[in-house]
């Protein structure tokens, strides 16, 4: 019984460390640009990158081995890893389906409607502001353009 309790304690500790380390982090990630306020959020990839992905996602989705191969470190990597890319755990779905936010897995992950495939994002436990999700939905509705 003691070994089981130690094992459960180790698992809980590992999960907590993972969740805490995936927060907005310190340093450049999650910080507004030096010398000014954050630019307004618009339904363009560059704006979403600066205001959402770089602020709320790169704490986990960066580096050499990001979760599910999804690097969101730059607008280029975000576009390459999101638009028309199959979901690794369910290749019948795509991460971002241009013109169709209701069939874009990214929206399901952000809204917590992803079903049994993983957890809602961002993982740190605080849901993304609905106004940010609405702008991402609009970007997808507009065709999820790179420009």
Set out the residue ranges of the language-model regions.
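Post-cleavage N-terminal segment of exported redox proteins
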Residues: 1-43, 137-147
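Solvent-exposed helix-loop boundary motif
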Residues: 26-41, 46-130, 134
């Amino acid at each position: 019984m003691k070994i089981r309790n130690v094992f459960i304690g180790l698992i809980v500790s590992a999960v907590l460390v993972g969740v805490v380390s995936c927060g907005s982090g310190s340093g450049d990630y999650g910080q507004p640009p030096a010398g000014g306020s954050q630019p307004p959020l618009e339904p363009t990839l560059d704006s979403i990158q600066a205001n959402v992905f770089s602020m709320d996602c790169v704490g986990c989705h960066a580096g050499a081995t990001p979760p599910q191969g999804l690097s969101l470190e730059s607008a280029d990597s975000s576009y390459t890893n999101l638009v028309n890319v199959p979901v690794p755990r369910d290749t019948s779905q795509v991460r971002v389906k241009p013109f169709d936010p209701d069939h874009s897995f990214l929206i399901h992950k952000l809204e917590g409607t992803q079903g049994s495939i993983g957890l809602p994002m961002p993982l740190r436990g605080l849901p993304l502001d609905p106004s940010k999700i609405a702008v991402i939905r609009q970007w997808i509705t507009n065709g999820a353009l790179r420009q």
